Every structure is written in structure tokens, then in C-alpha cells.
Design a protein with these regions (language model features):
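ATP-dependent carboxylate-amine ligase
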Residues: 2-165
Length: 165
């Protein structure tokens, strides 16, 4: 919607306060400061939609937003509705991840097995199989004061897990 405004209206004439109350919709890049007992995590919730292009841009933003010294983790869910290109495109996102500054990568879903197998060995975390393993990752396995980006298609259910934390 911003691109429509930019392309069709004189940007200089727009009210400067127009976007002050704009909030990022849940599961589309929203940031959750999660605390349970003494553990604190910053979770970037990108769990509503995923395709190779949105994945690449979300990962680039995640990389550039946080310092290189920060502990950064990635939870990747299946990208769905890719048809016959699904395997190839899940492999392709491994290339983006391998170039990133992420410390460890965890995957969830059968299709992300293709991604996991193409990751550099030193950043491979674990392939997670169910909601309990995801909650254990968030509540127990990740170090305190770390950053986690969750990216996957809506129907993987990752967004429901994150929203219910």
C-alpha cells in the first residue's frame, strides 16, 4: 500500500504524521520481547507468509538490524504452495542462510529437510518435528538474551505457536 501512495500521490504533500500510528501486523515482521522466568528473547515473527523472496528480504533485515556479535537464531518452517519447484526453492534459501550472520538454524516441516541438508555444518541446529520441540527450543535451548527469527507459511502453524507464547 505504501508503494501505491508513493507512485500515485505527491509525497511532499502527505501529512507527515500519517504513519505515526502504523503497527506491523502480527506474524509479518512484528517483534516480540519474550520473557519466561529469567530468560529473555527477542523474537522476530515472520510466521504468516513465506516464499523465497520474502525469506531473503526478512533474513537480510534480521542480519542488518542486530549486531554481528548478537546471538542470532533462525527457525524455518515450510514454504508452501510452490508446486513442482518446492524442493529447488527450499534448497535455494539455504544459500541465503549460509551467507547470513545467523549462529544456528532450526527447521520445522518435511520440506525444510532440503534446506537443513544444504546448510553449512557449523550452523545446523536441529530438525524439529512437533510443537513440543519448538517450545523446548524457545524456552530451554536458546541462550538468554538471544534473537530468534521465525519464518514459515501460515499453515505450518508456527504463527499460532508464537502468538500463544
Amino acid at each position: 500500500s505504501l508503494s501505491i501512495i508513493i507512485n500515485y500521490f505527491d509525497i511532499e504533500k502527505l501529512n507527515k504524521n500519517l504513519f505515526l500510528d502504523f503497527n506491523i501486523p502480527k506474524s509479518r515482521g512484528s517483534v516480540l520481547n519474550y520473557k519466561k522466568r529469567s530468560k529473555k528473547l527477542t523474537i522476530v515473527d515472520e510466521s504468516y507468509n513465506s516464499n523465497p523472496l520474502s525469506f531473503k528480504f526478512a533474513l537480510e533485515k534480521f542480519d542488518s538490524t542486530y549486531r554481528e556479535s548478537d546471538k542470532k537464531f533462525l527457525l524455518v518452517g515450510n514454504m508452501l504452495e510452490l508446486g513442482k519447484y518446492s524442493k529447488k526453492l527450499h534448497i535455494k534459501i539455504a544459500k541465503y542462510i549460509n551467507k547470513s550472520k545467523v549462529n544456528k538454524v532450526y527447521t520445522f516441516g518435511k520440506l525444510t529437510e532440503h534446506t537443513f541438508n544444504k546448510l553449512k555444518p557449523q550452523i545446523r541446529g536441529k530438525m524439529l518435528n512437533n510443537n513440543k520441540e519448538i517450545l523446548n527450543l524457545i524456552n530451554k535451548d536458546l541462550p538468554n538474551n538471544s534473537f530468534l527469527m521465525v519464518k514459515g507459511s501460515n499453515s505450518t502453524g508456527l504463527n499460532k505457536i508464537i502468538q500463544n507464547l
